[in-house]
A protein has these predicted regions:
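Short, contiguous acidic/charged loop-to-helix segments that flank catalytic cores in large enzymes
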Residues: 85-86, 163-165, 176-183, 223
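Active-site lining segments that contact anionic ligands and/or coordinate catalytic metals
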Residues: 10, 19, 44-45, 169-173, ...
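Single conserved hydrophobic/aromatic residue that forms the stacking wall/gate
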Residues: 216-228
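ATP-dependent adenylate-handling active sites, centered on carboxylate activation for C-N bond formation
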Residues: 102, 148, 167-173, 189-198
Length: 228
């Protein structure tokens, strides 16, 4: 089997090893239940051939790396590691640091599921406030809210897939953590819903810096549409 990574290293390729076998994946979260251990991360442009008992390097890695930071912010599964950095640890640490610095007076921290939860757990620990699950996600039928091609469907998805819990938010000064703001679809609707369900105050903290450019290969916004 030959495994190759793109020349800029924008997406990961991870090699795993167990007795008598090697495997390649883009998500190291696939390894634990198959008894593989991470052997190495391919560098940008690196190519290897895998045999049952060893790896042969066919092309050395390039020096430049332009990995997509959104892997840690949004796309990545919590147990995956990219370039040796675990997704959940990065999200938790960003929230922890923000909570330690934040001077806002809030009653609890909450996360927009799924990728905002790790940040919110870190924020709660850093701030010294409880974590409340005030919004749950209904996953069977709704995709990610930024991927539909038209605004009407994006708004519908953002509204329908997240279900507020009045018992956990009524009368509270809530601080919500989310991974990023792309078009602002989810943020706008969530804030309104939280007030409608009785929140006293709604504060938001975002893990990702402003998005200023788009990806050309998926249904993300053009330069004109990001909220930033």
């Amino acid at each position: 089997i030959i495994a190759a990574r793109d020349q800029w290293g924008r997406t990961p390729v991870v090699i795993g090893k167990k007795d008598g076998a090697y495997a390649a994946t883009s998500e190291s979260s696939s390894f634990p239940n198959l008894d593989y251990e991470i052997e190495k991360y391919l560098g940008p442009g690196e190519i290897v051939r895998m045999y049952p008992d060893h790896i042969e390097q066919l092309r050395q890695p390039n020096e430049g790396m332009q990995i997509c930071s959104f892997l840690w912010v949004y796309y990545g599964f919590p147990t995956s590691c990219y370039e040796g950095k675990n997704v959940e640890e990065v999200r938790f640490t960003s929230g922890l640091k923000m909570g330690q610095m934040d001077k806002s007076e809030v009653d609890c921290a909450c996360g927009i599921p799924d990728s905002g939860v790790g940040m919110a757990l870190g924020y709660a620990e850093g701030k010294g406030v409880p974590y409340h699950r005030a919004i749950s996600k209904y996953t069977p039928t709704w995709p990610r809210s930024f991927t539909p091609s038209n605004q009407e469907m994006r708004s519908l998805v953002a509204k329908m897939k997240l279900i507020p819990n009045r018992a956990m938010l009524q009368g509270k000064r809530l601080l919500f953590c989310d991974d990023s703001i792309v078009r602002g679809t989810q943020l706008r609707d969530n804030v309104k819903i939280l007030y409608d369900y009785g929140a006293k105050e709604v504060h938001m903290r975002i893990a990702c810096p402003p998005l200023i450019l788009s990806l050309i290969h998926i249904s993300e916004p053009t330069r004109r549409t990001p909220i930033s």
